[in-house]
Amino acid sequence: MSTSSLGAVGVSTATAPSAGATGAPAARAHAVEVATLWRPSAPCTPRTCVDATGPARAVPLAALRLVAVLFLLIAGFVASPLGGRIPSRLIRRWCRWVVRASGVRVRIDGGAAPDGGLLLVANHVSWLDIPLLAAVRPARMLAKSEIRDWPVAGWLTARSGALFIDRDRIRALPDTVARIAEALRAGEAVTVFPEGSTWCGRAQGYFRRAAFQAALDAEVPVQPVRLHYRLAGGAPSTAAAFVGDDSLLTSVWRVTRSRDLVAEAEVREPMAPGSRPDRRSLARAAEEFVLVGTHRAEDAGPRNTVPFPAGGGSRATEQASAAPAREALTA
């Protein structure tokens, strides 16, 4: 289920806009070619990229953790209210339980994300990215429309307030960007994975631009977040990667079998409204913060991080090791 992205796409603006796409600023900014299909993908596969040779848990304990994760998925489905969106505080708590049940240690490095309308952008590696980013700030996700048809997870994704994109209908992209901008203007946070697909962490894509137009139109900050998965000793790990033809069950099992797996989110400086003149430069700057910096971080030694917050309140610092596709869950 790699939870993912709007792979924000840089659509050519040289052609005429699609019908009905002339109203909102975001719509006017996204003229598209009729025949173009946008389906970002990554060359990563479980066989070529995923290495789960680190310390492993005993099978019985891993099986218990797998059952716990599946139980939480089902419990979230059963316990969710019948009408309306699930409150963000409940989503954050539920995400925290899922991560803990999987046996992954989480560390957050950097300052708090701003309040109010905010576009969160991050590199995309795993289904764990979503609960990891919920620790930074609960947000509405941009998800590919196919997710709605997934059992349990599709229901929960829709009920969390996710914004969906139909990746087979590129004419719908301007409307998607406009809906993101509307949510941002309403003071909500929206999370996007601009690579548009999950990558193993050793290789990476590039940031597509469309979602950044929404931040420009809504005049809100962009919050880059760099995600890494490492072993407790500091070595990068691809065990959490959810790529290629990997199934969700296989990926969850690999994670629950992995011992000493650490997920890290590095919260970079927010990019203020108006700090970049257009979506191209904004996407490029965010990519520099997230993707280029990820490779640098893999060569870095230990750094100060803070533990995954258990509830509200302060976060005490502690020393921890630094850390390092399948179609994205969010388009």
Model-derived features: positions:
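Catalytic-site beta-strand/loop segments enriched in glycine and acidic/polar residues
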Residues: 183-211
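Soluble, non-transmembrane catalytic domains of enzymes that act on hydrophobic metabolites at membranes
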Residues: 1-50, 105-111, 130, 165, ...
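Generic beta-sheet signal
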Residues: 116-122, 162, 188-194
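Membrane-embedded segments
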Residues: 131-179, 188
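A cross-family acyltransferase "interaction/gating" segment
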Residues: 152-154, 201-277, 285, 297-300, ...
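Glycine-rich active-site/cofactor-binding loop and its immediate structural neighborhood
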Residues: 116-125, 129-136
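A transmembrane-helix-recognition feature enriched in membrane-embedded lipid enzymes
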Residues: 47-107, 155-160
